[in-house]
Amino acid sequence: MTGAEVLDVGRDAIWLTLQLCAPVLIVGLVVGVIIGLFQALTQIQEATLVYAPKIVAIFISLLIFLPLMGSLMSGFMRQIAARIAGM
C-alpha cells in the first residue's frame, strides 16, 4: 500500500466520521438555539432547561438516522475489505 492509498483511506475515514456525526450535531445545535432563543425572549434563566429537550432530540435523531449511519459504515467497511483483498 502506497502513501497515497493510505492518505486516501484516511481522508475517506474522516469524511465518514463527519457524515456520521453531522445529523446528530445539527439537531443538537438547532434545538439548543431554539431553547436559547426561547429563554432570551421569556427571560427564563434556568440553566437546566436546555438539557432535557436536547437529550430527547438527540435520542430521536439517533433513532431516525441510525439506518443511514449503518449503511454508511457498512459501505466503508466493504470498501476497506475490497482494498485489503486487492493487495
Curated annotation (Swiss-Prot):
GO terms for biological process: bacterial-type flagellum assembly; protein secretion. Keywords: Bacterial flagellum, Cell membrane, Membrane, Transmembrane, Transmembrane helix. The keyword NADP does not apply. It is a multi-pass membrane protein. It is found in: Cell membrane; Bacterial flagellum basal body. The chain crosses the membrane at residues 18-38, 55-75. InterPro entries: Bac_export_3, FliQ. GO terms for cellular component: bacterial-type flagellum basal body; plasma membrane. The keyword Iron does not apply. NCBIfam families: fliQ, PRK06010.1. Role in flagellar biosynthesis. Belongs to the FliQ/MopD/SpaQ family. This is Flagellar biosynthetic protein FliQ. It comes from Caulobacter vibrioides (strain ATCC 19089 / CIP 103742 / CB 15).
